[in-house]
Amino acid sequence: MSKRGRGGTSGNKFRMSLGLPVAATVNCADNTGAKNLYIISVKGIKGRLNRLPSACVGDMVMATVKKGKPDLRKKVLPAVIVRQRKPWRRKDGVFMYFEDNAGVIVNPKGEMKGSAITGPIGKECADLWPRIASAANAIV
């Protein structure tokens, strides 16, 4: 199992279905004032010719804010994906998915810019990012 790059975290990440390619728009699940995040790259992806880099729950991406506060727009910000609609299989055999795609804005170390998260987050994300897990109200 290859680990995929994450800044400032420890722990193993198992293979998951990659549900969010570059150019996907996801909801912003924190209280920073951003509404939508547009994925422009995925951290730690080596890639192959003509293949779009894709992200899944727990991955750090570089994103821009498409809707939200003017001071957040037109900047490249790191974000962590906390929910995805594409089903993935967990080690216990359960197929898991959420009803929307969502991410939270973080700093390069993985500390949240906001102070609260709306909605549940995936267990895979909570295991890798303890600062995000502490702000979540539900971990599924």
UniProtKB/Swiss-Prot annotation:
Belongs to the universal ribosomal protein uL14 family. GO terms for molecular function: mRNA binding; structural constituent of ribosome. This is Large ribosomal subunit protein uL14x/uL14z/uL14y. HAMAP family: Ribosomal_uL14 (MF_01367). Pfam families: Ribosomal_L14. GO terms for biological process: translation. Keywords: Ribonucleoprotein, Ribosomal protein. The keyword Ribonucleoprotein applies. Coiled coil: none annotated. SMART domains: Ribosomal_L14. SUPFAM superfamilies: Ribosomal protein L14. One of its GO terms (cellular component) is cytosolic large ribosomal subunit. NCBIfam families: PRK08571.1. Transmembrane segments: none annotated. It comes from Arabidopsis thaliana (Mouse-ear cress). It comes from the Eukaryota. InterPro entries: Ribosomal_uL14, Ribosomal_uL14_CS, Ribosomal_uL14_sf.
